[in-house]
């Protein structure tokens, strides 16, 4: 399968999506941040000096989705219909799992926006709590689901 982001001279190009059909596109991505108990408890108990960590991560994740095309060179700017973020508390492992669901009506998908949303949300948590735990790890950033477009639906294997 030839790479769509290279022209005949093997140089980078942005794919022309002008002839593609506008359809509803949805993408769901997820990722996790793990930390020590002190950092986890500080977040849960709202004791982080920088402010409300999880709420700030949600806002940052929304901004990440909106700014995706500015940071990923071949990503088309897309008008987003919505970005919805959920953060699950995982007390047993002192971690948080962040889910981002992005929706649009467009000629190209929103997978990159969902992945960027998760990444920026998790990085924001790291930034806000790094004074407590510099050894935090971000892992498992992945596309869980996508629908719409010519390639159809995708669901990650569980």
Swiss-Prot record:
A Pfam match: MoaC
Q: Which reaction does it catalyse?
A: (8S)-3',8-cyclo-7,8-dihydroguanosine 5'-triphosphate = cyclic pyranopterin phosphate + diphosphate
Which residues does the Swiss-Prot or TrEMBL record annotate as the active site? 127
First-tier enzyme category under EC:
lyase
Alphabetized GO MF terms? cyclic pyranopterin monophosphate synthase activity
| Binding-site list for substrate | 74-76, 112-113
> Membrane among the record's keywords?
no
Among NCBIfam families, the record links this protein to:
moaC (TIGR00581), PRK09364.1 (NF006870)
Name assigned to this protein = Cyclic pyranopterin monophosphate synthase
Lineage, uppermost ranks: Bacteria, Pseudomonadati, Campylobacterota, Epsilonproteobacteria, Campylobacterales
